[in-house]
Regions:
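N-terminal signal-anchor module of multipass membrane proteins
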Residues: 1-76, 81-95
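Short, non-helical or kinked segments that cap or interrupt transmembrane helices
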Residues: 48-53, 70-82, 127-136, 181-186, ...
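Membrane-embedded alpha-helical modules
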Residues: 96-206, 322-437
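Intrinsically disordered, low-complexity non-transmembrane regions of multi-pass membrane transporters
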Residues: 1-26, 204-228, 263-270, 425-444
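Interfacial segments of multi-pass membrane proteins
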Residues: 86-93, 173, 303-318, 324-329
């Protein structure tokens, strides 16, 4: 008598209901673990709420799936690209300044719907001429290099623990297999945290005092905390001008991520549901998260790795992971464990992460074969790098302007990004052609 065989491991599964609910739940947990290390590290680095981060990572993912018609198996986690913006406006996570940083990120999120509308109206090819790799590459490189000093400062509290964190991440990433290779950050944090605990570097008093169940939102860190007599319009303007340009780099990253997910799943998400829908979903998720004191959201490459490993491409599995993140956000005890993470652990992991941010910028230049024998390209890239880094590491750390009685501080990244975009637009010889067909072919 013939029997129906179960799907082979190498077979792509687009309807996970055939696996049964228990296995779907386990697959969802796997995606949760994949995004976990990087997602919870961002609030630790910026001073934002870990619980709010998990809540709006889950809600943002569900919103993204709704706006993209539930077709793209993408998880939205915390974006590292905006850490430099938080550091510029609210250094060391100063509580009274975090709402201004969140306002800047929310305004950056507004650029996503604008770009989505432009993509819809004019097509990606025309719009992307203003954001070629010769501009976005150096911006991304600058983000990582500007953050490097904070990573070193954290490592100096205990270099042994920091080096262990780096070593675990490198070993897992290079020689790991299966899920070990996909979650190196999570494993690096776990191992170095355990070593730091053994060395007496961790204070668990906050964990003992934290309740098991509680609300995840810290209202003093939200944009709503700005509505009062203490509102500083100059600082708000500074935050917006400083952080908004970072959105251009993250939007380029988004396009690459959607292409990679499509290639992995053998589906053309560039065409259906379309970049205008995925950008809109990502942008609105970022705006929602920022208003309530959580980091900006972005599509996660770690979850793309899980898709490639499991060959289960059902978006419902990602939505299970999102729901698990939401449930976990209501446990302050868990958030306290993350908040107790010592600086040396954060520093070790940050060394790798910030370096990878800059390396992504370099890869962007190489993959797009930017011609640096062309003086035009050299000038654009040089000014972006020197202005971004030079101003950031100057004594003032920013350019201070007085406009109509309002004091505005422009960070190095803001100045470098704006100068790069303007120079690219006005200098002759802009021959960059955004090849939509290549993205579509990769997804087909």
């Amino acid at each position: 008598m013939s029997q129906s065989s179960a799907p082979a491991v190498t077979d792509a599964i687009y309807d996970a209901s055939s696996l049964g609910r228990p296995r779907m739940f386990l697959l969802g947990l796997q995606h949760l673990f994949a995004m976990f290390g990087a997602t919870v590290l961002v609030p630790v680095l910026t001073g934002l709420s870990v619980s709010a981060t998990l809540l709006f990572a889950g809600l943002g993912t569900l919103l993204f799936h709704f706006l993209s018609r539930g077709k793209v198996p993408a998880f939205l986690g915390s974006s590292f690209a905006f850490i430099a913006g938080y550091a510029a406006i609210a250094p060391n996570g100063e509580a009274e300044l975090l709402p201004y940083a969140c306002l800047g990120v929310a305004c950056a999120g507004l650029l996503y719907p604008v770009l989505a509308a432009l993509f819809r109206a004019f097509g990606a090819k025309r719009v992307m001429r203003f954001f070629p790799p010769v501009v976005t590459g150096p911006i991304v490189i600058s983000i990582g290099l500007i953050l490097a000093s904070s990573a070193i400062a954290n490592c100096q509290t205990n270099w042994l623990v920091a080096v262990i964190a780096v070593a675990v991440i490198v070993i897992c990433n290079i020689w790991g297999r299966g899920m070990v290779k996909i979650v190196p950050i999570l494993l690096g944090v776990a191992v170095s945290y355990a070593v730091a605990t053994a060395l007496g570097e961790v204070d668990f008093s906050g964990v003992a005092a934290a309740p098991w169940v509680g609300l995840p939102i810290v209202w003093d860190s939200t944009v709503f905390a700005l509505f009062g007599p203490q509102f500083d319009s100059g600082l708000a303007t500074t935050a917006i001008i400083t952080i908004m340009p970072l959105a251009f780099a993250t939007m380029i990253e988004h396009i690459g991520d959607i292409s990679a997910i499509g290639s992995t799943c053998e589906r053309n998400y560039i065409a259906d549901p379309g970049l205008h829908r995925t950008l809109l979903g990502d942008g609105l998720a970022t705006i929602l998260a920022s208003f309530f004191g959580a980091p900006a959201n972005t599509t996660y490459g770690e979850n793309t790795g899980v898709l490639a490993l499991t060959r289960v491409f059902d978006p419902r599995v990602i939505r299970i992971a999102a729901c698990c993140a939401i449930v976990l956000s209501f446990c302050p005890k868990f958030a306290a464990v993350i908040a107790a993470m010592p600086a040396c652990v954060i520093g070790g992991v940050s060394l790798v992460l910030y370096g990878m941010i800059s390396a992504v910028g370099v890869r962007n230049l190489i993959e797009n074969q930017v011609d640096f024998q062309n003086n035009r390209n050299v000038l654009v890239a040089a000014l972006v790098l020197v202005l971004s880094l030079g101003i950031a590491y100057s004594t003032a750390g920013a350019i201070v302007l007085e406009l109509g009685g309002v004091t505005i501080s422009l960070s190095g990244l803001a100045v470098g990004s704006l100068v790069g975009i303007v120079l690219n637009a006005i200098l002759p010889g802009n021959d960059f052609e955004f090849d939509v067909s290549e993205l579509e072919e990769a997804a087909e």
